Amino acid sequence: MNEILFFSPQPLFSHMMNENSRVHTHSNLRHIFFSEIGIGISGNSFLLLFHILKFIHGHRSRLSDLPIGLLSLIHLLMLLVMAFIATDIFISWRGWDDIICKFLVYLYRVLRGLSLCTTSMLSVLQAIILSPRSSCLAKFKRKSLHHISCAILFLSVLYMLIGSQLLVSIIATPNLTTNDFIYVTQSCSILPLSYVMQSMFSTLLVIRDVFLISLMVLSTWYMVALLCRHRKKTQHLQGISLSPKTSPKQRATQTLLMLMSFFVLMTIYDTIVSCSRTMFLNDPTSYNMQIFVVHIYATVSPFVFMSTEKHIVNCLRSV
């Protein structure tokens, strides 16, 4: 009996240490995530305001201005919705009903889909802008913005239809302990659908992601090839010993290439982790890490786009 009393505190102490470590990690993730959300909301608000003022004052706009302004609006709304959802992830309210859960999660997933569609179309548009006059893409320059806008609208409606299964599967977390539900927030969970329905919707989402990412990869590869060809031609004309200056259009393209590459990696990471959570792992800590990582693009992108705007750069340098 004495041996039992002597050794029994050890598992309890270990459990308390693990629990304290988990709470500490959760608290750190909460502070980091809300800081990320705050920075992203500020950056996208500033970028959106810049494009609105640019339009009101009648400045000459580029073909990419409308998609970039639309992307900043989408990211602003997405981060605002995510900030509201995150309060129920990191702060245990458990006060949402089915309607609130369905509305917020579905709206967030639609905005995520719009972000993917707009980013992909922006990559294609930049490839069209950069294409030389002799290219077969040159004929799309005049009507490219109209085509891109129609494509974004079509893909958005298509994704809203595909994502409508969330209106059925998202429910308020019941007051019972079960491993069948997939964690979303403290108040909301995903009710697993039948194997056939889950496979069908997952296949449609994978097809959509593969199609849009393939467009981004192809347009990125095309832009890299054009930049390399232009650089070789410039070096041949000016001499290899001289380093040719990069034009503003090329600098903007190079910046966009880095941003697109990062976005593709984040999308692939999100897809892999989401599938693993659905099939194998339902761990809230890994889920919190996932939502932090996948929002880096929405947080960083407005500052990257602003770095290519000469008016903003000159204004900041004069301060």
Curated annotation (Swiss-Prot):
Disulfide bonds join 101-188. Glycans are attached at residue 175. Residues 53-65, 131-150, 225-254, 307-319 are cytoplasmic. PROSITE patterns: G_PROTEIN_RECEP_F1_2. It is found in: Cell membrane. It is a multi-pass membrane protein. The keyword Phosphoprotein does not apply. GO terms for cellular component: plasma membrane. One of its GO terms (biological process) is response to pheromone. Belongs to the G-protein coupled receptor 1 family. This is Vomeronasal type-1 receptor 51.
